[in-house]
């Protein structure tokens, strides 16, 4: 939890901030959705098949890093199916009655979206299993000797779950999703399309070079791209510059301390501390957390994922190590590796 709070303070966090509205930039159909080509095409097939049969689509699980479009795709699925959409999140469903209230208010073939589904209470999961498999809800009414079991028939529905940590899902829950789909980081060219589209929707004049400058610093994440685009728009408006070109975008993002690889001050502090204090590693995560005055969860869940994905650090059995990419990015020369000296077999050295 602490890691999520820390990450939410970062401009380049892929997580949605409380009160942040990005609906204006969201695509409204699969045709408008950029990137995730195989996932998008497969979803189109499943949607068409469900509509042709007049049935609820099979349950869908989206998993992958935050900010890649899981919520947007869930809404698009409902829109393309021509059915209602109801959204909630795992932590908001506290007791079985909360889930029952949601499920009993669904119309036939509606889409129920549960974000952060890995954070569902295990007791809630037990109630969800028969609802997903048989469209039935088994509840215990009352307490003690007066308690009785009640079975409620539910309309057929499609559950769309989203998680950033699929490894935390229980096997029984994961196995009940007939359509598991992974979302991956976006290519720069895909983000250029997203940024260009976003600038049009925001009424912002942006050159192709300006769009690429924003895209390449967006950490492969559309949500980050949209956030950076808005901040660049602010700087350009105050400076009275239009259209926004690469020079203005670069100046604005430098002011925001987001460098050319999408790294921010926290990322650079992590890399610099490893280089300056520990010679590039290997160093344990607990030692790093203490050196950075951060919690271990923050280091593992907030700082490291993107650095590992981009090849700046690697995990080894002995700890974290900087790669050649990291040393180059820091403008430093890695220390020469000193191979361990083995004593001569016939020498008197211990």
Curated annotation (Swiss-Prot):
Mg(2+) binds at residue 71. Its EC number is 3.6.4.-. This is Holliday junction branch migration complex subunit RuvB. GO terms for cellular component: cytoplasm; Holliday junction resolvase complex. DNA binds at residues 296, 315, 320. GO terms for molecular function: ATP binding; ATP hydrolysis activity; four-way junction DNA binding; four-way junction helicase activity. PANTHER family: HOLLIDAY JUNCTION BRANCH MIGRATION COMPLEX SUBUNIT RUVB, PTHR42848. It catalyses: ATP + H2O = ADP + phosphate + H(+). Has 3 domains, the large (RuvB-L) and small ATPase (RuvB-S) domains and the C-terminal head (RuvB-H) domain. The head domain binds DNA, while the ATPase domains jointly bind ATP, ADP or are empty depending on the state of the subunit in the translocation cycle. During a single DNA translocation step the structure of each domain remains the same, but their relative positions change. Residues 1-186 are annotated as: Large ATPase domain (RuvB-L). It comes from Rhodospirillum rubrum (strain ATCC 11170 / ATH 1.1.1 / DSM 467 / LMG 4362 / NCIMB 8255 / S1). Belongs to the RuvB family.
